[in-house]
Regions:
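Short N-terminal secondary-structure initiator segments
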Residues: 1-14, 80-103, 181-189
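Generic structural signal for well-ordered, non-transmembrane alpha-helical segments
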Residues: 28, 32, 95, 177-180
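Acidic/His-rich, divalent-metal-binding segments that scaffold phosphate/diphosphate chemistry
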Residues: 1-78
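A general alpha-helix detector
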Residues: 8-11, 33, 84-85, 138, ...
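Divalent metal-dependent catalytic cores for phosphoryl transfer on phosphate-bearing substrates
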Residues: 43-150, 154
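Charge-dense, low-complexity intrinsically disordered segments
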Residues: 17, 21-24, 129, 163-166
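Charged phosphate-binding loop/patch that engages nucleotide di/tri-phosphates or the phosphate backbone
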Residues: 161-189
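Exposed alpha-helical structural elements
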Residues: 4-11, 50, 96, 100, ...
Length: 189
């Protein structure tokens, strides 16, 4: 039996190709880490089924984006993959999952950053708000779509985020305190 998230992935990524492989491998790593962190923190009462589903779908919008290095040959700028995914999931009747899509980029994107950097996004805050949104965004920072077999350390994740500004680093460091150092869910290489 197919899971709900798998049916959505199959609808938008019907062919067994490199992009589908990248999406599923990356998303599974994010989901596994998010679930491992959530299970260590039962006092947070996180919705584990939702965490898994939303983590598996958080990057669904990459198919619409132009990022040839990861086999994405759409027309939208990559920075918009969260918004594109949110649009797709809202059309699927998944508004809660859509919020994860549109709020996971970087450590969230502020209205101010969109305005000052002239990003091709609506002028509003796209910051993770719920604990589940924050957890999935946090877990995502430890994996890239170009090195699928590697899990970043906290220091490596911070270095990746640093180029986008101090406010994202502040949010990320707060998540390190809230959710803890991540366990290795992939063998370090």
């Amino acid at each position: 039996m197919q899971t709900g998230y798998q049916a959505v992935i199959d609808r938008y990524y019907p062919h067994d190709n490199e992009l589908r492989h990248i999406l599923i491998t990356h998303s599974r790593s994010v989901a596994d880490l998010a679930l491992a962190l959530a299970k260590r923190l039962p006092e947070l009462c996180l919705d584990l089924q939702f965490v898994e589903e939303a983590a598996m779908l958080h990057d669904i919008g990459i198919v619409r984006c132009d990022a040839p290095s990861i086999h994405c040959f759409g027309t939208e700028p990559y920075i918009a993959h969260g918004r594109q995914g949110a649009e797709m999931l809202r059309a699927e009747g998944m508004p809660r999952h859509a919020r994860v899509c549109e709020r996971h980029t970087g450590a969230g994107i502020t209205r101010e950053a969109i305005e000052t950097q002239h990003l091709p996004l609506p002028l509003q805050d796209f910051l993770p708000e719920t604990l589940e949104e924050q957890l999935i965004c946090y877990a995502d920072k430890f994996f890239s779509k170009t090195k699928l077999d590697r899990q970043k350390t906290v220091e490596q994740a911070e270095k990746s985020l640093a180029k986008f500004g101090e406010d994202g680093l502040v949010r990320f460091r707060a998540w390190v305190k809230r959710f803890g150092e991540p366990p290795m869910v992939l063998a370090a290489k």
